[in-house]
Amino acid sequence: MQHRSFFLLALVALLAVTTAVAKKKDKVKKGSECSEWTWGPCTPSSKDCGMGFREGTCGAQTQRIHCKVPCNWKKEFGADCKYKFESWGACDGSTGTKARQGTLKKARYNAQCQETIRVTKPCTSKTKSKAKAKKGKGKD
């Protein structure tokens, strides 16, 4: 009699486990029906950079996924637009800046990115960079 009870209990437990697994597979299939997701920008949880969330929609479905905005990103391009940059050009004496151009390498999450961009930065003298390099190595 005890063997029958044990066998019946084991059979019920096995049935419960297989039912739970089948339900989980159905959930995965329902979520994967959508193939055209539209993703918004990564919005940091605090300040301008760091961990945040990105919202995506597909039909009536909405998802939020974790994402990260690098702290060295340039706001004018967006964190999801990746560019390949040329070398810095010569220093323009009239403006005191040098420039370089970047061409779009990758647009993540269907981001709207410019094909080419131009960035500038102030010119620096060679002596300053050498002094910083020496200071960083512990030589004064």
Swiss-Prot record:
Required for high affinity binding to PTRZ1 by interacting with the chondroitin sulfate chains of PTRZ1 (site feature) positions: R100
Induction, as annotated: In arteries 3 days after injury. Expression continues to increase until day 7 after injury and decreases slightly by day 14.
GO biological process, any: positive regulation of artery morphogenesis
Record's signal peptide: 1-20
Highest taxon in the source lineage: Eukaryota
Disulphide bridges, residue numbers: C34-C58, C42-C67, C49-C71, C81-C113, C91-C123
Keywords linked to the UniProt accession: Developmental protein, Differentiation, Disulfide bond, Growth factor, Heparin-binding, Mitogen, Secreted, Signal
Disulfide bond found in the keyword field: yes
Gene3D superfamilies recorded: Heparin-binding Growth Factor, Midkine, Chain A- C-terminal Domain (2.30.90.10), Pleiotrophin/Midkine, N-terminal domain (2.20.60.10)
Compartment annotation: Secreted
Tissues of expression: Expressed at a low level in arteries, and at higher levels in newly formed neointima. In brain, expressed in the caudate nucleus and the brain stem.
Record GO cellular component, one term: extracellular region
Gene Ontology terms for molecular function: chondroitin sulfate binding; growth factor activity; heparan sulfate binding; heparin binding
Described function: Developmentally regulated, secreted growth factor homologous to pleiotrophin (PTN), which has heparin binding activity. Binds anaplastic lymphoma kinase (ALK) which induces ALK activation and subsequent phosphorylation of the insulin receptor substrate (IRS1), followed by the activation of mitogen-activated protein kinase (MAPK) and PI3-kinase, and the induction of cell proliferation. Involved in neointima formation after arterial injury, possibly by mediating leukocyte recruitment. Also involved in early fetal adrenal gland development. Secreted protein that functions as a cytokine and growth factor and mediates its signal through cell-surface proteoglycan and non-proteoglycan receptors. Binds cell-surface proteoglycan receptors via their chondroitin sulfate (CS) groups. Thereby regulates many processes like inflammatory response, cell proliferation, cell adhesion, cell growth, cell survival, tissue regeneration, cell differentiation and cell migration. Participates in inflammatory processes by exerting two different activities.
Quaternary organization: Homodimer. Interacts with ALK. Interacts with LRP1; promotes neuronal survival. Interacts with LRP2. Interacts with NCAM1. Interacts (via C-terminal) with PTPRZ1 (via chondroitin sulfate chains); this interaction is inhibited by PTN; this interaction promotes neuronal migration. Interacts with NCL; this interaction promotes NCL clustering and lateral movements of this complex into lipid rafts leading to MDK internalization. Interacts with LRP6 and LRP8: this interaction is calcium dependent. Interacts with ITGA4. Interacts with ITGA6. Interacts with ITGB1.
Similarity comment: Belongs to the pleiotrophin family.
Protein name: Midkine
Taxonomic source organism: Rattus norvegicus (Rat)
Organism phylogeny: Eukaryota, Metazoa, Chordata, Craniata, Vertebrata
